[in-house]
Design a protein with these regions (language model features):
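Class I SAM-dependent transferase core
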Residues: 2-69, 107, 111-121
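Conserved SAM/SAH cofactor-binding pocket of Class I
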Residues: 59-152
Length: 152
């Protein structure tokens, strides 16, 4: 792990993310940057500051996810942001929350499947554009949905 990146991860402690989670997040970030050379997953200009721009930004919503939830849905998951980052964090916490990652792009879906298998995450890729279908609101984490809808 690059020392400068390790220091950046310490910001996650304010979000109650344990230090033991940092290596897995850094490994995901490294795999993301590597795959980004072949498949456009994130903007090239954001690669240099990807710890802040992608990992820490994704982790910032962990407090709005109810720990008792059974399912968390990431619509338009793309590079797995925030879904994969959250799945890694919740796995390290010992949580059983399942993450459904909806992504319409075959290339991005294949990347997500590789990541899920690599980290043995409680997650599944649904390769479809869920935004064009009616969302089954009963399946959504109601606490998260309600907090998001009242904040915007």
């Amino acid at each position: 792990m690059i020392e400068s990146n390790l220091k950046k991860y310490f910001q996650l402690e304010t979000l109650n993310v344990s230090r033991e989670t940092f290596p897995a997040l850094e490994e995901f970030r490294s795999l993301l940057i590597s795959e980004n050379k072949k498949t456009n997953l994130i903007g090239r200009s954001t690669e240099k500051d990807s710890v802040n721009r992608h990992i820490i930004d994704s982790a910032q919503i962990i407090d709005i996810i109810d720990n008792n939830s059974k399912l968390c849905i990431d619509l338009g998951s793309g590079a797995g942001l925030p879904g994969v980052v959250l799945a890694i964090i919740f796995k390290k916490r010992g949580s059983n929350i399942k993450f459904d990652l909806y992504e319409k792009s075959l290339k991005k879906s294949n990347f997500l499947r590789k990541i899920i298998k690599h980290f043995e995450l409680n997650a599944e890729v649904k390769q479809k554009n869920k935004l064009n279908q009616q969302i089954n609101r009963e399946r959504l984490n109601k606490k998260t949905y309600n907090r998001l809808s009242t904040n915007y």
